[in-house]
A protein has these predicted regions:
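N-terminal basic, amphipathic alpha-helical segments
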Residues: 1-44, 68
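Conserved core of the PLP fold type I
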Residues: 43-188, 193, 199-213
Length: 213
């Protein structure tokens, strides 16, 4: 029996509710590793200060205050952004979906890392796109040489890459390989969609730069 990516993803997500299952299928740390009490205190203070804000809508492109803070934080990652450059979404999957919708049509081909996060495969399947899997090394990240060969062979409309701590390999691309990735996509006029969701997870020292930097 054929099993769709969406059906498989739903099965994995259902298992996340089982306390006896070690969650390796989703990128969610155990609650004991998070400063939950501190975060709850901050949320409570904000709710008391602006009680109506938490029960009202924020319309696109998102809260002006939040977008200003994101733009400021982006400076730490080597990116100069204006709040007007930023659109907030309800999660990473929505952001990736919006990016793909902006540069592809059903039937188009997208280059992705292999192995890839199942949610990415689910989004590509739901949008009627095709995926070309590019080999990824756990130490060096996506193979630039393999991506070049794929671009030579297929009409690829976008590249979706996670340069910093890719899921599920945890691979971190070097700054040199990030530059090569950007230069390759620019030379082929292929949009590069960078997913930097894990860029802040550096255990020590400065966070790695995104490819955009």
């Amino acid at each position: 029996t054929d099993v769709s990516v969406s059906a498989f993803a739903l099965k994995v997500l259902r298992a996340t509710r089982d306390p006896d299952v070690l969650q390796l299928g989703v990128a969610v740390p155990h609650s004991s590793l998070l400063p939950t009490r501190v975060l709850n205190g901050i949320l409570a203070r904000i709710a008391r200060r602006d009680a109506g804000r938490g029960v009202s809508y924020d319309f696109p492109p998102g809260s002006p205050e939040l977008r200003r803070q994101i733009a400021r934080r982006a400076l730490d990652a080597g990116c100069t952004l204006s709040p007007d450059d930023i659109v907030t979404t309800s999660g990473c999957q929505e952001a990736l979906s919006l990016c793909l919708r902006a540069v592809t049509r059903p039937g188009d081909t997208v280059a992705i890392e292999s192995p890839a996060f199942y949610g990415t495969l689910q989004t590509i399947e739901q949008m009627g796109l095709k995926a070309i899997e590019i080999p990824t090394c756990p130490r060096k990240g996506v193979s630039i040489e393999a991506l070049k060969l794929a671009l030579d062979r297929w009409k690829i409309k976008a590249c979706l890459i996670v340069p910093n701590f890719s899921n599920p390999t945890g691979a971190l691309m070097s700054d040199d390989n990030k530059r090569r990735l950007v230069q390759l996509c620019e030379s082929r006029k292929v949009p590069l969609i960078e997913d930097d969701i894990y860029g802040e997870l550096q255990h020590a020292g400065q966070r790695p730069l995104p490819a955009k930097a």
